Amino acid sequence: MKIKTHRYENVQWGRAHLPFFKEFDLYLSNFFEVESVNYNKDGNTFSGPITLINNVGNFGKTPPISDVECVIENSETGETKLLSFTEYFNSYACHIAKSESCTKTLLAHFNWGNVYYWMRRDQSVKSLTKISPWIFLPFQEFDVNSYRIKRGEIKEMDDRMVWLGSGVDSYRKMIRVVENKGYLQPIMNFSHEHYLDKLINSKIGLSYYLDLEKYNTPFDHPGEFCYRDIEYTLLGIPYIRIEFKDTTYNPLLPNKHYISIPREHAYVAYEKYGDEGVADLYINRYKEVINDSEFLEYITKNQIEWADNNILNNNKHKLTFELLELKKWIK
């Protein structure tokens, strides 16, 4: 059985999706004869048309995709499956997803509340049953087990919350407030290796995607998962965050896989006191749990179990294969 994978490979971006797509090609080769087509011929083209067997709406046989998508096509029937790490479903992914030939779409940024509006905008509510939550990945792969072992050998950890990244003076101003109040380790830029060392030496993490003013409609900054969330989870580092609305197929659950701040509390605090109010919610939750070793150990145990079952040991490939229902293609 022959299949073809279509994508624009963006090596320059250096994020997790391209390595995953290539790994998944290899996984698929256990079941099919796989031809992989990279449409980025000059090294600088990161979106554009691909060539399929069947028509996709007004685009005919050449619908556009971006570098965060991969289309898997059955070379005999023209049936397609779509994998997408996009935050903006209505930019490219929607065209493939709503086509008659596409029987399954997996979204890394999936929100049950938003997906209806995404499909409605494209007049494709009937295709909702084909859209499913998927997985999310760390920024890049690393030796998770070795860092887990190192963390287990550390006698004294930094009690302050840890968060490393950018945007704290623009679209993540709340984090700067927490830092200025002394509850967050100094925010710096590190190499990836130094970053991981910083994480495992920390007792508790902070997770935060964007200031709450950004979430105005289902189409504004809809993706709230961050690489840090998965890196914390892989390493078993409890982290505090506002309750997720986005979900993976096997969801990260509040007060099971992370330390939750109720979403409604965050919006009330923001409405009354702005970023300062949200920062105080984080600080108060931190004070509540920092010395509760039983609760933190419970979170860690559940995080590691989730990571092992959904990400590590080829399980991200196995789960993807199952969710795409590719077993039906095996003859």
Locate predicted features:
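Short, Lys/Arg-enriched, disordered terminal segments
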Residues: 1-2, 328-331
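Nucleotide-sugar donor-binding catalytic core of glycosyltransferases
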Residues: 2-49, 53-257
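Catalytic binding pocket for nucleotide-activated donors in carbohydrate/polymer assembly enzymes
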Residues: 200-327
